[in-house]
From Swiss-Prot:
Source domain of life: Eukaryota
GO annotation, cellular component aspect: extracellular region; extracellular space
GO biological process: antimicrobial humoral immune response mediated by antimicrobial peptide; blood circulation; cell chemotaxis; chemokine-mediated signaling pathway; inflammatory response; positive regulation of cell migration; signal transduction
Disulfide bonds: C32-C69
Xref: InterPro entries: Chemokine_b/g/d, Chemokine_IL8-like_dom, Chemokine_XCL1/XCL2, Interleukin_8-like_sf
Keywords in alphabetical order: Chemotaxis, Cytokine, Disulfide bond, Secreted, Signal
Region annotated Disordered, chain positions: 91-114
Positions in coiled-coil regions: none
Name of the protein this chain belongs to: Cytokine SCM-1 beta
Length: 114
């Protein structure tokens, strides 16, 4: 009897785990229903993503975590994306060109006299 209950409990747990995994990829999909025409200040935008689908859009994510969909063909949207890309490239270049200090000599040659 205990074995039967343990087996049923195991099956229920496994089923719950599998069912959760099946629908999880849908909830992560980002879609826009409408596009804003109101210009967003670059200083308030943290990052952006571009979606391809039934409604093509740029999703700006503000520093407060709000997601705002905008038309990728709008001039102001292209300007903001270019500005964000420039900031990102500048940060990456600064990180890559940081001085690492002086490098220790790795010469391990030994001269033997004999």
């Amino acid at each position: 009897m205990r074995l039967l209950i343990l087996a049923l409990l195991g099956i229920c747990s496994l089923t719950a785990y599998i069912v959760e995994g099946v629908g999880s990829e849908v909830s992560h999909r980002r879609t826009c229903v409408s596009l804003t025409t109101q210009r967003l200040p670059v200083s308030r935008i943290k990052t952006y993503t571009i979606t391809e689908g039934s409604l093509r859009a740029v999703i700006f994510i503000t520093k407060r975590g709000l997601k705002v969909c905008a038309d990728p063909q709008a001039t102001w949207v292209r300007d903001v994306v270019r500005s964000m890309d420039r900031k990102s490239n500048t940060r990456n270049n600064m990180i890559q060109t940081k001085p690492t200090g002086t490098q220790q000599s790795t010469n391990t040659a030994v001269t033997l006299t004999g």
